[in-house]
């Protein structure tokens, strides 16, 4: 039925709100005004003007008209209005994304199995019709109030029967759920959907995304940190892909593994399914039929066989006029099963198998469409697995390309929307699979058959499947698998395939792991049962200083650890725990974990918000609050927005680490290099430590790894530690350093800077005590003149007042400034344009403090004479002068040295290092002092 272009159809609905917004339109929640039924209407953008939108719209409509199954969202109506297409769907209350918001620590195991089973059934029906969804993610999985899962959004789905010339888009599927072959730009098939199922299975289990990569290259490395290095064939594709030109993966000799990642969260049976869904080699990955027969779904299969569900059977499933006589033997069994259940699908699947002359068991051995457990097991041999695959992956619709979709009506004009929503009797799933089942013999070379043995070659065939996993491999190719020379990559040169791969293998097979890994984790991959004693030094091994294993000329470990490597890997309990360990299930992540040391060199640490990688979404996902872990839930609370921007190792921190940086006690051990590195890393979140001593990565890791927001933000409020506990000493320093006292010189310096007493220069020590009084008089005399000069020339601008207040508040004088302070840190106390104003202010304040003493009439005549003598003596005998000149030189001329063209840092170092230069030669400083004294005399 052709949908007329009428403008009043939308008037039947009352718009209640906006459900969501996607790349090609908006989804509205509406109520039918007559029936009061709640529906979801997907309103596409201007499809008449935009060819891409039109193509996507047509594709989705074709898919939805074909896919009638209980776990696929139902298309109720389609109409056009003002050039825009409207699709009316059943309304489902929420999606899995919102479910994960409500349950930040994951879903109970039974619900996980139920959701995954329903998802696999929906994908199985798609794959039976040669449709690959390619964008399976929590946002596209709707969940009703009675926990029925619905797969939606077929805008990126692809019909595999479109042939060799089909333009298979590489950028499909949200990045976190994209398979390695998609990321590498390799030919792909149905297994890309199965990879997404494995990722969702992990995310449902603990509430955290399994592979949260922030770019294609980072996604590939994030996968390898858990699953290990890519196979050599995929490495070839990586090095030959121009997008990754010049890049190289760091060695991952000790991947975290799914066992460690989900220890205490997934049972062994469900973990086995997950491992088979997340095989790096797509040829080894489970397809839908193998998943549905997995022992973990035994309860769900029994529920599907329940007779009470057979009453929901739709008549169009058995009214097909195209059923052949060969179908009669299974037609009776088909009536016993639910029309939308997977059992019916597999029965239909088994109908066409005798035509393909496959050596399968008789149809009677199928229970509800599934082989009996003794006959078909997920642990059965690979040859038998491969022999059962044509049913689930044969391309039996190649001949007519789903005739009712590509009907002659659509050949008239591609701009016409010809959408017959009413299903014909011949369009039932039972018959759809049989229309071209005679072609199944010619289409046996589907993607799963290509792996009958890992190194087996494909059998040549005239009618090789055009839509199989190897559809882009040249016909002349007789290579082991899909990953040889794909058209999209060109030939591999010797330099690419030999030298680069040898370098990669050298990294992967590197045996000198003790250089990068603590001895406690060297034998974690050994087949023997490890000893439990390796956890004794867990707390000291948290620093990545011993685990930066990527300083080998690759993209080095320049970034703090990724969110995944912390929250996903560091918090997961290693597999090597046995019964002798004392870790409880409620907190299984306190142990040293395997993927801990793999900092992603491809990560910028600004993790994208969940599920926002493909479509820009206005709604930022609210993360769950931090809460205690329940038994069996081994992860921290669902990441909040702060965690998405930085890696969070969480429980791995020792309990005493309540601030986001190492304690002062740690800083005294780490020396000067770690202190300077820490000061740089505190400036911003994304500083990249390049030091080789391993301490800087430790600082960064402690800086950004707290899972609680208040602790993440606390490092803005806690003063940075100083070397050798001077963090505390600077705060208690007094301002009496202008007086002849030892209090300031003894407490305000670190080990590397000996204390300096301005009153005890070498000349002072050699002179008699009667000169001390003259020193004081000369000092106070110069102070008084200085005060008069500053009163006549007001220069107390805003920054000076601010720096003066800061200086008074911190009670730090010029002599108490550590020599290690960098010039950039001085900007906290003074402006860069006038670096020594604060010193002048400090000295000026000291003179005002001692003003009663300086105004004493006994000192004034002596001070005037003493000042003249000292100034003249400095000119003639600079090194022998030991009276008032020493105090004047030490305390006073430095502010007047500002007119000399010096950098702020050099001026301060000259100020602090006066004691060193004076003992050797005073010539550099004398120039400044002479100019200053000449000015004073005027």
UniProtKB/Swiss-Prot annotation:
Residues 13-297 form the Protein kinase domain. It is found in: Nucleus; Cytoplasm, Cytoskeleton, Cilium basal body; Cytoplasm, Cytoskeleton, Microtubule organizing center, Centrosome. The modification Phosphoserine is found at residues 407, 479, 720, 761. Its EC number is 2.7.11.22. Residues 407-417, 549-559, 679-704, 769-778, 817-827 have a biased composition (Basic and acidic residues). This is Cyclin-dependent kinase-like 5. ATP binds at residues 19-27, 42. Belongs to the protein kinase superfamily. CMGC Ser/Thr protein kinase family. CDC2/CDKX subfamily. Residues 298-348, 382-566, 646-865, 877-938 are annotated as: Disordered. GO terms for cellular component: centrosome; ciliary basal body; ciliary tip; cytoplasm; nucleus. PANTHER family: CELL DIVISION PROTEIN KINASE, CYCLIN-DEPENDENT KINASE-LIKE 5.
């Amino acid at each position: 039925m052709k949908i007329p272009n009428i403008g009043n159809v939308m008037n039947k609905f009352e718009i209640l709100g906006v459900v969501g917004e996607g790349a090609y339109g908006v989804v509205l929640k509406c109520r039918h005004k007559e029936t009061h039924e709640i529906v979801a209407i997907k309103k596409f953008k201007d499809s008449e003007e935009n060819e891409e939108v039109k193509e996507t719209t047509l594709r989705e409509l074709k898919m939805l008209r074909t896919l009638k199954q209980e776990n696929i969202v139902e298309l109720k109506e389609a109409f056009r209005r003002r050039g825009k297409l409207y699709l009316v769907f059943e309304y489902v209350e929420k999606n899995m994304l919102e479910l994960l918001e409500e349950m930040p620590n994951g879903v109970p195991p039974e619900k996980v199995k139920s959701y995954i089973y329903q998802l696999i059934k929906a994908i199985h029906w798609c794959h039976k019709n040669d449709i690959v969804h390619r964008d399976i993610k929590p946002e596209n999985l709707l969940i009703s109030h009675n926990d029925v899962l619905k797969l939606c959004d077929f805008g990126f789905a692809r019909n595999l029967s479109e042939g060799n010339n089909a333009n298979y888009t590489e950028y499909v599927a949200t990045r976190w759920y994209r398979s390695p072959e998609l990321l590498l730009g390799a030919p792909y098939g149905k297994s890309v959907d199965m990879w997404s199922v494995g990722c969702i299975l992990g995310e449902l289990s603990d509430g955290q995304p399994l592979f949260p990569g922030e770019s294609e290259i980072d996604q590939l490395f994030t996968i390898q940190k858990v699953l290990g290095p890519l196979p050599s064939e995929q490495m070839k594709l990586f090095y030959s892909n121009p997008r990754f030109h010049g890049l190289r993966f760091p060695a991952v000799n000790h991947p975290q593994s799914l066992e460690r990642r989900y220890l205490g969260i997934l049972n062994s049976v469900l973990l086995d399914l997950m491992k088979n869904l997340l095989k790096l080699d797509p040829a080894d990955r489970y397809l839908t039929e193998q998943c549905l027969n997995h022992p973990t779904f035994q309860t769900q299969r029994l529920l599907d066989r329940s007779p009470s569900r057979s009453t929901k059977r739709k008549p169009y499933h058995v009214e097909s006029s195209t059923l052949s006589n060969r179908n009669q033997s299974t037609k009776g069994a088909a009536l016993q099963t639910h029309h939308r259940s997977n059992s019916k699908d597999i029965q239909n699947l088994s109908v066409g198998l005798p035509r393909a002359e496959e050596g399968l068991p008789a149809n009677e051995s199928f229970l509800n469409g599934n082989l009996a457990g003794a006959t078909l097991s997920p642990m059965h041999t690979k040859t038998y697995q491969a022999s059962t695959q044509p049913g689930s992956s044969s391309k039996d619709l190649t001949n007519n390309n789903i005739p009712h979709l590509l009907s002659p009506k659509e050949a008239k004009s591609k701009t016409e929307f010809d959408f017959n929503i009413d299903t014909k009797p011949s369009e039932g799933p039972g018959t759809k699979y049989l229309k071209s089942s005679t072609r199944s013999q010619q289409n046996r070379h589907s993607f799963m058959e290509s792996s009958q043995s890992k190194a087996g070659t494909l059998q040549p065939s005239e009618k090789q499947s055009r839509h199989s996993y190897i559809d882009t491999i040249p016909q002349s190719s007789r290579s082991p698998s899909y990953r040889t020379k794909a058209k999209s990559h060109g030939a591999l040169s010797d330099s690419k395939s030999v030298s680069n791969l040898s370098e990669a293998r050298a990294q992967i097979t590197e045996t000198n792991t003790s250089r990068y890994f603590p001895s406690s984790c060297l034998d974690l991959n050994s087949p023997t049962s490890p000893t439990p004693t390796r956890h004794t030094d867990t707390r000291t091994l948290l620093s990545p200083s011993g685990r930066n294993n990527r300083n080998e000329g690759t993209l080095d470990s320049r970034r703090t650890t990724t969110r995944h490597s912390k929250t996903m890997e560091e918090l997961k309990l290693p597999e090597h725990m046995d019964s002798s360990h004392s870790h409880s299930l409620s907190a299984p992540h306190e142990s040293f974990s395997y993927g801990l040391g793999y900092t992603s060199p491809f990560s910028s640490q600004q993790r994208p918000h969940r599920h926002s990688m493909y479509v820009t979404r206005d709604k930022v996902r609210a993360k769950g609050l931090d809460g205690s872990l329940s038994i069996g839930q081994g992860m921290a609370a669902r990441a909040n927005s702060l965690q998405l921007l930085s890696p969070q190792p969480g429980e791995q921190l020792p309990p005493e680490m309540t601030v986001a940086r190492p304690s002062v006690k740690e800083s005294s051990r780490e020396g000067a290099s770690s202190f300077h590195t820490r000061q740089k890393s505190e400036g911003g979140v994304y500083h990249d430590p390049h030091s080789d001593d391993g301490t800087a990565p430790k600082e960064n890791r402690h800086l950004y790894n707290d899972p609680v927001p208040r602790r993440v933000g606390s490092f803005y409020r806690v003063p940075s530690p100083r070397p050798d506990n001077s963090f505390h000493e600077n705060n208690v320093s007094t301002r009496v350093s202008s007086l002849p006292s030892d209090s300031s010189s003894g407490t305000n310096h670190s080990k590397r800077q000996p204390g300096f007493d301005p009153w005890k220069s070498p000349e002072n020590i050699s002179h008699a005590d009667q000169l001390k009084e003259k020193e004081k008089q000369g000092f106070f005399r110069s102070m008084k003149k200085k005060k008069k000069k500053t009163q006549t020339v007001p220069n107390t601008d805003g920054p000076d007042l601010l720096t003066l207040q800061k200086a008074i508040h911190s009670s730090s004088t010029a002599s108490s400034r550590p020599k290690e302070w960098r010039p950039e840190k001085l900007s906290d106390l003074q402006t860069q344009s006038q670096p020594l104003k604060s010193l002048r202010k400090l000295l000026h304040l000291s003179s005002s403090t001692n003003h009663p003493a300086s105004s004493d009439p006994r000192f004034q005549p002596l001070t005037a004479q003493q000042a003249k003598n000292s100034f003249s003596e400095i000119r003639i005998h600079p090194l022998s002068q030991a009276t008032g000149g020493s105090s004047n030189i030490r305390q006073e001329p430095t502010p007047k040295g500002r007119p000399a063209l010096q950098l702020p840092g050099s001026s301060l170092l000259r100020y602090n290092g006066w004691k060193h230069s004076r003992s050797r030669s005073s010539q550099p400083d004398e120039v400044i002092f002479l100019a200053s004294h000449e000015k004073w005399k005027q």
